[in-house]
Regions:
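Short helix/loop segments within enzyme catalytic domains
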Residues: 2-58
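Non-catalytic terminal regions of proteins
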Residues: 60-257
Length: 257
């Protein structure tokens, strides 16, 4: 890079450090709050973004495998590399899969990887690439092997979930917010109700929180689309039932105050 030779390990560490905010949002704000539903939500969203001008069925590659970097002069007068904060979509999916493995959901993690490999297009990429954001002549394309990024993903996911943090009173994020098999069972139950057009929350299944409803909405929408329902029709059904469920959760909470 420039006149310097950078070891791959340093480059990989730098990439994860520069993108850790978005990675943590996926792990903590996605997987730990909504469980496997987040993988479907994420993959559907990325696919929609990347096909909005052509439509999903006319777009071969639904997940991005490239991004950009910046070179800026630091206080010492040297040029410093920084990766843009959003990791390419394909790698984000594999990081989410690593987080699902970490919370004990290997089957869902496998599903995430399979869907990502399908959505990425003609073939699974060998490298993820970054180009200079300004298109400056002479600056190289940075290429990091996909397999190396994947191998590092479980360590990154585990650190984000399990590392005690001073800001949280020396407990980990995974001790504050978490998704368990019990959480998933509630979300699956609600998803079945939504797909049937039912919105009355059960009173014999323990506490139901808005996170259960939100996760269920993603699962139900995915389920309807997979069964052949037109996406717009499915969205209308899920929106109506999910909003009614959220109203009930809010009313229950306000009654307890």
């Amino acid at each position: 890079i420039g006149k310097q030779r950078v070891p791959l390990a340093n480059l990989l560490t730098k990439m994860y450090a520069d993108t850790i905010g978005e990675v943590d949002a996926d792990v903590s704000g996605g997987v730990l709050l909504a469980g496997p539903a987040f993988l479907y939500n994420m993959l559907m969203t990325f696919s929609a973004f990347n096909s909005r001008r052509r439509g999903v069925f006319n777009q071969r590659q639904l997940l991005r495998t490239s991004s950009f970097y910046e070179m800026e002069e630091n206080a010492n007068g040297q040029m410093a590399l920084s990766f843009l904060p959003h990791p390419p979509d394909y790698i984000r999916a594999h990081i989410v899969a690593a987080a699902l493995d970490e919370i004990g959901m290997p089957n869902e993690a496998k599903q995430c990887r399979l869907l990502a490999d399908q959505a990425v297009g003609w073939k699974v990429p060998e490298f993820i690439t970054w180009d200079d954001v300004n298109g400056t002549k002479g600056r190289p394309t940075i290429k990091i092997p996909v397999e190396d990024i994947k191998r590092a993903a479980p360590f990154v996911a585990r650190a984000l979930i399990r590392t005690p943090l001073e800001s949280l009173g020396k407990v980990s994020t995974g001790e504050v917010i978490y998704w368990t098999p019990k959480s998933e069972a509630k979300a699956q139950m609600l998803a079945e109700m939504m797909m049937d057009g039912e919105s009355q929350l059960p009173t014999d299944k323990g506490d139901i929180h808005v996170t259960h409803v939100i996760a269920a909405a993603s699962l139900a929408y995915w389920g309807l689309c997979k069964s052949g329902t037109q996406p717009r029709d499915g969205a209308a059904v899920i929106e109506a039932t999910a909003l009614k469920m959220i109203d009930q959760v809010r009313n229950t909470f306000e009654t307890r105050k």
